[in-house]
Amino acid sequence: MSDAGCGLLLFSPAGVLRSVVPLRRAAARLGKLGFSVSIDADATARIQRFAGDDETRLAALHRIAGLRPSVALATRGGYGLTRLLDRIDWKRIARSVDAGTRWVGMSDMTSLQLGLLAHGGGVTWAGPLACDDFGRSSAEGGVDDVTEGCFVEAMSGALEAVGFRTDVGFDGLDVRGTLWGGNLAIVNSLLATPHWPRIKGGILFVEDVNEHPYRVERNLLQLHQAGVLDA
């Protein structure tokens, strides 16, 4: 990677890590990709289903924002960031982005990403999770080569385009706008809250897994009926 040895910090803002093995495996693999990897002191904390209590996880966010690593990569998703949104120092997070920190993740990280967009903006990265994407064993399918390659290129500034599979005959679209979104369930949960970004003419993307089709349809209908898809 062109930004060889850039600092990458692993942290757990939401669900608890059930095992440290995937975390260690992810750190080792990311190190081999050229990142200088460190692990937040509370990344393996455990309180019930969370990676530490709310105070611990909130302090970790603010601490990481102060450290300003090149990449702040969440270890996993789950649930927990929504509980912190009313107390996050958004200006501190925004200053870290301005200083070059790339906050990366998906799933529950959508709460932080959209919250930051709502409270003054700042570019974040919808991307892989350390343990889920870089911590899998060979028996679990290992690391996806495309994910690995795109992540390295994106974090080094070398990624020029991302391709998607589409139906036969689809000729593509020529549109421009703010690219925003994330996990569909989290996107919907932020509607009518202070942490909902008001985007006009944007391009909304959504992701979700293990949801029944009717739930996906219900969430999309809610966005449509709330006027989000017509903005």
Give the positions of each predicted feature.
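N-terminal glycine-rich "phosphate-gripper" loop used for MgATP/nucleotide binding
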Residues: 71-87, 106
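Short, acidic/small-residue loops that bind anionic groups at enzyme active sites
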Residues: 90-115, 123-130
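Conserved anion/nucleotide-ligand pocket segment
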Residues: 122-188, 192
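Short, conserved loop/helix-junction motifs that constitute active-site signature segments
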Residues: 3, 91-99, 226-231
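Internal helical hairpin/lid segments
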Residues: 195-231
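ATP/NTP phosphate-donor binding region
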Residues: 1-68
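Short, solvent-exposed amphipathic alpha-helical segments in soluble enzyme
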Residues: 24-29, 89, 219-225
